[in-house]
């Protein structure tokens, strides 16, 4: 009972438990049964509200509600999906997104028509690779192209990344590639934010000559990563810096923090305003607006939406004079994300981001009483370096089990690379990106983007140097699902409780390590036609083909 005030932190955990059960099932539970069960358990929780069993009843109600909600969201997302390859066939549709400005480009088409499919069997969205786009084509334009369409790929191996599941919840029912050059059928509609994204990307591409630096700048500013050269992308991954390219909480937090500080400092220059009005709240409201605009500019993907929820809740706490940014805020953000997008629970981005944030907040709550003394004792610069080191270590350790589960690889020198790259991104690259974007309407973006390019060059040099070190990348069999679940349970127990019994969470982490250590890679895998084999005998994987995927293991 000593930690009764922490019980509420477990509410999203039980809701997530129900969602996790849904996605672990190999059959679709009838929606009317899960809805009835959710209603009955909710009534039971209400009945037990004055009983000592109320916490257990509420936990059960939330778990069943999560099971129902995941199924309900699946029904809402259900749409036609291509079941077999077809083509050549004429495909037309309106461009929803494109991943780059020029050259070979991947586009997502909505409102699609396929000449060889009836309307009721035509996917609502298609993802195509085409050699180029015709002049004047962009988001909102309608194009037509001769293409070959394929079903969305299944996991490459059992338990691996499932592109078909992700595509299902994004409304994408087929992939394919163009067999010729697309034709423009209708000019682009006025889709302001998409045209703005690509306009900013084009201006950056003209201002920064180096392709690698330009690709990173475009990715950080607009979320478009198609212009980043493959070699640079690989070096960034191998150095453990890939998170810098994926616009998430780090980036939105930096933008919101910089805007908040700038607006508050500017308003403080007028004593008559600063003394009479709540300028801090005005700055927080402006920062929320800036973060929302940045989310739209980055494509409003699920990770950026999740990050915006976190940032907005933190700034709303400032506006209502609740300055403590604690674990309740993290729990509320997780609840909001799971309600909006239950599928997010299964994604690497959700697991990595919330693992890092929860661990950082838990460590902050533990160290909060001594932070002021440490800052005065060390001085500003040493304290900042120590805080950066601690933040990097905590985030790396917290995300390691989930990175092992999803990727089966670690960047051995990622800690050192992040200690150099993250401060450069926070205090050099992102401020220059904001200034450059704001200066574009005046045509004055060249100088801020030159400063941004210099910072990106430093990060790229760090990535290339670190990734070239011997043993920079360590590969191993992915952690089994059971290990990831044990790590999540242990980590949550450590982070959500505050008394000594939180240390029982170490048992969950130890179990995760034991499960991972005992996992044995398959000796033999075969595709659905039994034409592709892989044998693990000397630690290597031997493939007869490289295009198919594995469906079973021996």
Residue ranges and their predicted role:
Residues 1-25, 316-318, 435-453, 457-460:
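Hydrophobic alpha-helical segments
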Residues 1-81, 192, 306, 481-482, ...:
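N-terminal leader/targeting segments
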Residues 2-5, 64-243:
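Membrane-interface helix/helix-cap signal primarily in integral membrane proteins
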Residues 9, 13, 209, 213, ...:
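Hydrophobic alpha-helical transmembrane segments of multipass membrane transporters and ion channels
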Residues 18, 93, 147, 220, ...:
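Divalent metal-coordination and catalytic microenvironments
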Residues 31-39, 352-353, 418-423:
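Alpha-helical transmembrane segments of polytopic membrane proteins
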Residues 40-41, 47-49, 55-60, 176, ...:
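Hydrophobic alpha-helical transmembrane segments in multi-pass membrane proteins
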Residues 94, 119, 132-146, 166, ...:
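Non-globular, low-confidence helical/coil segments that flank catalytic cores
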